[in-house]
UniProtKB/Swiss-Prot annotation:
Organism: Mycolicibacterium paratuberculosis (strain ATCC BAA-968 / K-10) (Mycobacterium paratuberculosis)
A GO CC annotation given for this chain: cytosolic large ribosomal subunit
Gene for this chain: rplY
Quaternary state and interactors: Part of the 50S ribosomal subunit; part of the 5S rRNA/L5/L18/L25 subcomplex. Contacts the 5S rRNA. Binds to the 5S rRNA independently of L5 and L18.
GO molecular function, one term: 5S rRNA binding
Keywords per UniProt: Ribonucleoprotein, Ribosomal protein, RNA-binding, rRNA-binding
GO biological process, one term: translation
Full protein name: Large ribosomal subunit protein bL25
Keyword rRNA-binding applies: yes
Function: This is one of the proteins that binds to the 5S RNA in the ribosome where it forms part of the central protuberance.
């Protein structure tokens, strides 16, 4: 199901820029942003933090935003987000100007559904694929079914069914999902034993290195 331009946000034009102004905006519950594209000069904005985060949480980063900027409507896509490494809050957003009917290139999430055959292990090699679609018709996600898939089964980007009007940009041979034989209990036990025996060896090597360093210092 494609997203529609229903994500209304009122954006204020920023009169101050710089780190200090950005910190003040965030303390006031706003998110600093820059809007660019179509040859226009970058426009510095402030977005309502709670509302913007809610749109991304419920509709995803490919959601088309309908911005109200000084009473004028502007469609935009979220191009990049700066996330605080500890608090995981949005620090800044880059927004791309889009127009109705315009095609854009975006990355769309791939999800796995179903249960593979007994004795198999499913690994996801790529979490997204890159596609080209109209800005107002970007798929929310793509689904790969691994129901009853046997070990040795692979799903590439080119095998994912795309809606009409959506073109694949990623390499069609890009491996997205891989079904392999699940490790046996014996293999897991051997792997665990190998890790245990490696630890003392590493400790001995470290001690030897420390002794050599100490001898070198004493000379």
């Amino acid at each position: 199901m494609a997203k529609q331009a229903l994500n209304q946000l009122t954006a204020a034009v920023r009169t101050e820029t710089g780190k200090g102004a950005s910190r003040r905006a965030r303390r006031a519950g706003k998110i600093p942003a820059v809007l660019y594209g179509h040859g226009t000069d970058p426009q510095h904005l402030e977005l309502p933090g709670h509302d913007f985060a809610a749109v991304l949480r419920h509709a995803g980063t490919n959601a088309v935003l309908t911005l109200d900027i000084d009473g004028k409507e502007q469609l935009a896509l979220t191009k990049a987000l700066d996330i605080h490494p500890i608090r995981r809050t949005i620090q800044h957003a880059d927004l791309l100007v889009v127009r109705r009917g315009e095609k854009v290139v975006v990355e769309v999430t791939v999800v796995i559904e179903g249960d593979a055959a007994p004795g198999s292990l499913v690994t996801q090699e790529a979490s997204t694929i890159e596609i080209e679609a109209e800005a107002l018709s970007i798929p929310e996600q793509f689904t790969v079914s691994v129901e009853d898939a046997e070990p040795g089964t692979q799903f590439t980007a080119g095998q994912i069914a795309l809606p009409k009007g959506v073109n694949l940009i990623s390499d069609p041979e890009l491996l997205v999902v891989n079904v392999v034989n699940a490790p046996t209990a014996e293999e897991l036990a051997e792997e665990g034993a190998g890790e245990v025996t490696e630890e003392p060896a590493a400790a001995e090597a470290e001690e030897a290195g420390e002794e050599e360093a100490a001898e070198a210092e004493s000379e």
